């Protein structure tokens, strides 16, 4: 889980929604597949405007601090093997189940967005919400260490068991990764894939070179044979 302040929100929206101003610094994004991304929850306002409207509706007794956490973000995904077992419709249902879990736990009205990225190494869900409880902003208490541990356990019970996901060790990051670790994992996977593609390209290049050498050798043999035939037929033509 990642916490964001006011100035962080617009860049997160650009990355999540892949808007026209987004300049990718993430090498694993394949923009030819960006059209396959989809929203499970999408508001008709920007992230910032949605948050501002929600805070205004709270009618808080004091002004929101400049360093207040206004958005908490989760990245939910799994590995290639898991998604390889699912059909496209099953993949979509998995992310719907994930979104429903967060909506029931923290209130659908507090979810800013839920968008699935299909244009990276593996599909994954970005879910952003406003940390509101008891009518106030409270990221610190809403997502303390105990709650995050409970969240991991409850998510597995509600979603993981249904989809046969392995339960990670409590408190570990083996299966429950925060945003930065998840991105790092995906970048490493992308690097491995890029290296594999480079090896395949090098192999194809070597095969092409071998074929070229073979073709040149055959051409030379044919030219030599033709030259020999011409030399052999020259005396016959002269005698005629």
Predicted regions and their residues:
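N-terminal nicking endonuclease/strand-transfer module with a His-rich metal-binding environment
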Residues: 1-240
């Amino acid at each position: 889980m990642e916490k964001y302040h006011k100035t962080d929100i617009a860049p997160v929206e650009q990355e999540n929604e892949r808007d026209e101003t987004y300049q990718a610094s993430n090498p694993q994004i394949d923009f030819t597949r960006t059209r396959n991304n989809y929203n499970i929850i999408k508001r008709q306002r920007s992230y910032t405007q949605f948050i501002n409207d929600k805070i205004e509706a709270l009618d808080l007794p004091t002004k929101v601090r400049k360093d207040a956490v206004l958005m908490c973000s989760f990245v939910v995904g799994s590995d290639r093997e898991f998604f390889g077992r699912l059909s496209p419709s099953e993949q979509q249902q998995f992310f719907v189940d994930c979104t429903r879990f967060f909506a029931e736990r923290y209130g659908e009205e507090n979810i800013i967005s839920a968008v699935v990225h299909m244009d990276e190494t593996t599909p994954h869900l970005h879910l952003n919400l406003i940390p509101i409880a008891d009518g106030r902003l409270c990221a610190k208490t809403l997502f303390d260490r105990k709650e995050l541990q409970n969240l991991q356990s409850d998510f597995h019970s509600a979603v993981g068991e249904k989809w046969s996901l392995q339960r990670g060790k409590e408190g570990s990051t083996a299966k429950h990764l925060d945003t930065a670790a998840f991105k790092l994992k995906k970048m490493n996977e992308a690097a491995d894939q890029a290296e594999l593609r480079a090896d395949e390209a090098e192999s194809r290049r070597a095969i092409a070179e071998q074929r070229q050498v073979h073709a040149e050798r055959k051409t030379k043999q044919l030219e030599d044979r033709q030259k020999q035939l011409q030399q052999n037929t020259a005396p016959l033509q002269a005698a005629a």
